[in-house]
Curated annotation (Swiss-Prot):
Name under which the protein is recorded: Eukaryotic translation initiation factor 4E type 2
Region EIF4EBP1/2/3 binding: start-end pairs: 54-57, 95-99, 150-157
Record keywords, A-Z: Acetylation, Cytoplasm, Initiation factor, Isopeptide bond, Phosphoprotein, Protein biosynthesis, RNA-binding, RNA-mediated gene silencing, Translation regulation, Ubl conjugation
A cellular-component GO term for this protein: cytosol
Length: 245
């Protein structure tokens, strides 16, 4: 499975901060907690390709989330529920993570895998996402693992050819269907969203009559879980055609 996508260049980053203690015990405890977080962040080494590894154009981070169906979720509780798995900067580092992860088809309940560029959280409200949107495809059960792998390999290999527009991808496992989506920065750029749609059709080998949804994150924030004005109704769950003699 090596060399399934072309490596380009790496992009690493780090952050740091400093804090001071206050005189009161209560404020001191708060500052200590914040200081510990910042010290941990500053000590975290930037993720870079190893010797002889094939660097990616961007660093990416895997995330995982799971929640109880039917329970209302605020943006704060949603953020707390997202768990970061790890960040990688090369083809080899990706496979080290991916080869040990459960495949989407084997997940149970209301679970999601997210793969986003480093520094972008898989949330509508993130600065990189707030003016963007996502293409959505609903799948019959049993197809998520293959489609997810094809999607993220295409994303890591820069097959969408839209510059920095791609933010990340999500696979959502539900009880009666699975959903994959790819997020971009600028929902108003129709040429870019159309190119993403066409590339998505190609890398997933979708039938020509497959109906896809595009939903802006602004619409998602206003009406979570509902059909919005810029969302196209997806009437038939896609399944591959079988060539039967």
């Amino acid at each position: 499975m090596n060399n399934k996508f072309d490596a380009l260049k790496d992009d690493d980053s780090g952050d740091h901060d400093q804090n001071e203690e206050n005189s009161t015990q209560k404020d001191g405890e708060k500052e200590k907690t914040e200081r510990d977080k910042n010290q941990s962040s500053s000590k975290r080494k930037a993720v870079v390709p190893g010797p002889a590894e094939h660097p990616l154009q961007y660093n990416y981070t895997f995330w995982y989330s799971r929640r109880t169906p039917g329970r209302p979720t605020s943006s704060q509780s949603y953020e707390q529920n997202i768990k970061q798995i790890g960040t990688f900067a090369s083809v080899e580092q990706f496979w080290r993570f991916y080869s040990h992860m459960v495949r989407p088809g084997d997940l149970t309940g209301h679970s999601d895998f997210h793969l986003f560029k480093e520094g972008i959280k898989p949330m509508w409200e993130d600065d990189a996402n707030k003016n963007g949107g996502k293409w959505i495809i609903r799948l019959r059960k049993g197809l998520a693992s293959r489609c997810w792998e094809n999607l993220i390999l295409a994303m890591l290999g820069e097959q969408f050819m839209v510059g920095e527009e791609i933010c990340g991808a999500v696979v959502s496992v539900r009880f009666q269907e699975d959903i994959i989506s790819i997020w971009n920065k600028t929902a108003s750029d129709q040429a870019t969203t159309a190119r993403i749609r066409d590339t998505l059709r190609r890398v997933l080998n979708l039938p020509p009559n497959t109906i896809m949804e595009y939903k802006t994150h602004t619409d998602s924030i206003k009406m979570p879980g509902r059909l919005g004005p810029q969302r196209l109704l997806f009437q038939n769950l896609w399944k591959p055609r079988l060539n039967v003699p």
